[in-house]
């Protein structure tokens, strides 16, 4: 019996400019507004009873900070994994192999543009030409048979923080 994997693709929240941290992109942190938006998005996910079995994050600070907020609020296991597969220059196929090798069915991945929109497009169509746009703190939910096969996934929904925070 094929299982279903639900992958929640989450872009990090608003971060400060590289210049605030000696131009080290990897160390850019979420701004106060960025944190607040991520917390609002998390509230929305909670209101929809969305729970993750695992949260996987890019190692860059702004993604990790986003992932920690998501993990603390929406993770069943409080299991936060850090993976270079979600770096801005990651490989879609390697990320899919990773997803196929973990038992968890409800997975949140936290990373960066344009990698994430390319990944969503690749899962839906086998083309990495991004035809979805991920806003900062935006979430895309894609469903796939397990194992995940590029081109065989379905986009369940995609929202930016403005939609998720609309009824606050």
Task: Tell me what each language-model feature is.
Residues 127-154, 161:
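Domain-level recognition of soluble alpha/beta enzyme cores
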Residues 2-90, 130, 134:
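Active-site-proximal alpha-helix that buttresses catalytic centers in soluble enzyme cores
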Residues 7, 104-111:
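Generic beta-sheet signal
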Residues 66-70, 95, 119-120:
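Hydrophobic packing residues within well-ordered alpha-helices of enzyme cores
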Residues 44, 69, 73, 101, ...:
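Active-site catalytic microenvironments for nucleophilic, acid-base chemistry
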């Amino acid at each position: 019996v094929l299982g279903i994997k639900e992958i929640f693709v989450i872009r990090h929240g608003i971060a400060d400019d590289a210049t605030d941290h000696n131009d080290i992109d990897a160390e850019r942190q979420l701004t106060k507004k960025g944190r607040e938006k991520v917390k609002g998005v998390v509230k929305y996910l909670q209101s929809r009873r969305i729970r993750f079995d695992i949260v996987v994050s890019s190692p860059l600070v702004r993604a990790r900070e986003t992932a920690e907020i998501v993990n603390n609020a929406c993770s069943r296991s409080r299991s936060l994994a850090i993976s270079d597969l979600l770096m801005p220059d990651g490989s879609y196929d390697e990320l899919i192999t990773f997803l196929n090798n973990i038992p968890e069915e409800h997975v949140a991945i936290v990373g960066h543009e344009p990698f994430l929109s390319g990944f969503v497009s690749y899962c839906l169509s086998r083309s990495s030409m991004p035809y979805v746009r991920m806003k900062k703190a935006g979430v895309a939910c894609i469903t796939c048979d397990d194992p995940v096969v590029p081109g065989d996934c379905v986009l369940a929904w995609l929202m930016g923080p403005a939609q998720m925070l609309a009824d606050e």
